[in-house]
């Protein structure tokens, strides 16, 4: 019988492959063993695809510098523990207790950053936005009342994150919830399935929006990839 953790792992992998984000949990045979097995996945769209809502310069720096640093640092940390580096990165964040004490903090930060960003790129698309339809749309209406109420609650969660972190729409078992996480913590660490997330670290928006986080959050609704979120919801509910 498939456990809840197994179902989450299956949903993470199948949805990423289906929507063009194959870099998560794949190995690069061209890398040396000292560098570790994890690679930076390419963006699933051109760097300027999300203009004017998220500018090309921000996307390039965010992906090529910030996300890349998480991958590089994760490989460096796990070079000290080859047995752990043999696992897909989502398994690492879901099973942090299995990581040695002296590595756990660094693995949590960098594996979390890798997982979160790989998901984040696929949670957005050119000409995105609108409202969710189908099973996810109905579930959002049932849980929150209306899409407008959901949007208000999600925006509040995102704008109220103190310092750096994320806001998420997650499945906790089969219940939809809105929550936030600090730093690069992932809902996967608590056994929850992220369906939608927004990065509210300043590097995600400061070049264009400066200190106007609320404006960035509002702009995000124009690039949401609801197809990706709906696919993850459907697969997880059936798992």
Labelled PLM ranges:
Residues 156-210, 218-224:
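An amphipathic alpha-helical core segment
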């Amino acid at each position: 019988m498939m456990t809840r953790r197994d179902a989450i792992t299956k949903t993470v992998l199948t949805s990423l492959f289906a929507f063009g984000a194959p870099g998560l949990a794949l190995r690069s045979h061209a890398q040396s063993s000292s560098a570790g097995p994890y690679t930076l996945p390419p963006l699933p769209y051109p760097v300027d695809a999300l203009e004017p809502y998220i500018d090309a310069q921000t996307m390039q720096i965010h992906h090529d510098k910030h996300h890349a640093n998480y991958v590089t640092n994760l490989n460096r940390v796990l070079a000290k523990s080859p047995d752990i580096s043999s696992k897909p990165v989502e398994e690492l964040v879901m099973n942090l207790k299995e990581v040695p004490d002296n590595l756990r903090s660094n693995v949590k930060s960098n594996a979390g950053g890798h997982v979160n960003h790989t998901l984040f790129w696929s949670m957005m698309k050119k000409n995105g936005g609108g409202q969710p339809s189908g099973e996810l749309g109905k579930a959002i209406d049932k849980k929150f009342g209306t899409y407008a109420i959901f949007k208000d609650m999600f925006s509040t969660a995102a704008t109220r994150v103190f310092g750096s972190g994320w806001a998420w729409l997650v499945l906790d078992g089969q219940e939809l919830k809105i929550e936030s996480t600090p730093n690069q913590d992932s809902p996967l660490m608590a056994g929850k399935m992220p369906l939608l997330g927004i990065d509210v670290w300043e590097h995600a928006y400061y070049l264009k929006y400066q200190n106007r986080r609320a404006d960035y959050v509002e702009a995000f609704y124009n690039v949401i990839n609801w197809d990706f979120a709906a696919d993850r919801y459907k697969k997880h509910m059936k798992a």
